[in-house]
Amino acid sequence: MRQTFMANESNIDRKWYVIDAEGKTMGRLSSEVASILRGKHKPTFTPHVDCGDHVILINAEKIYLSGNKAEDKIYYRHSNHPGGIKSISAGELREKNPVRLMETSIKGMLPKGSLGDKMFKKLHVYAGAEHPHTAQQPENYELRG
């Protein structure tokens, strides 16, 4: 009788992928990256195990925001002091800190809790085209669609 394969931390082969975000739509790119970080592209995917790969996302400053999201999409944060709410539009955040824009988008698509935190640590976002991970010999990843 065959048994269903269950991955665990010891038998997971992790790869490194480079994805160029230039001209890509933010939401579509984020969902694809979240899927890679989770390991859903592998036949050995196990929901309760971190079996994803490392993703290096370059050119985050050249991401495309469709529609009016650059002006209409608002990100909020609070300092926990009275009247301490701050807001910034997606377009302003892309100009000021494109890395945080992509990290926020991708983190929202990962599982909540400690497993999602482990998956998120395998994401490496850079505003420009350069990254310091050449020693890991990353492969270029072609997005679907």
Curated annotation (Swiss-Prot):
GO cellular component term, pick one: cytosolic large ribosomal subunit
Instruction: Tell me if Ribosomal protein is a UniProt keyword of this record.
Output: yes
Report the record's Gene Ontology biological process terms. negative regulation of translation; translation
Which of UniProt's keywords are assigned here?
Ribonucleoprotein, Ribosomal protein
Q: Does the keyword Ribosomal protein apply?
A: yes
**Gene Ontology molecular function terms on file:** mRNA binding; structural constituent of ribosome
Q: What InterPro entries does this protein's entry cite?
A: Ribosomal_uL13 (IPR005822), Ribosomal_uL13_bac-type (IPR005823), Ribosomal_uL13_sf (IPR036899)
* Coiled-coil ranges per UniProt: none
Q: How does it assemble?
A: Part of the 50S ribosomal subunit.
Cited function: This protein is one of the early assembly proteins of the 50S ribosomal subunit, although it is not seen to bind rRNA by itself. It is important during the early stages of 50S assembly.
- Give the protein family: Belongs to the universal ribosomal protein uL13 family.
Q: What is this protein called?
A: Large ribosomal subunit protein uL13
Organism encoding this protein = Macrococcus caseolyticus (strain JCSC5402) (Macrococcoides caseolyticum)
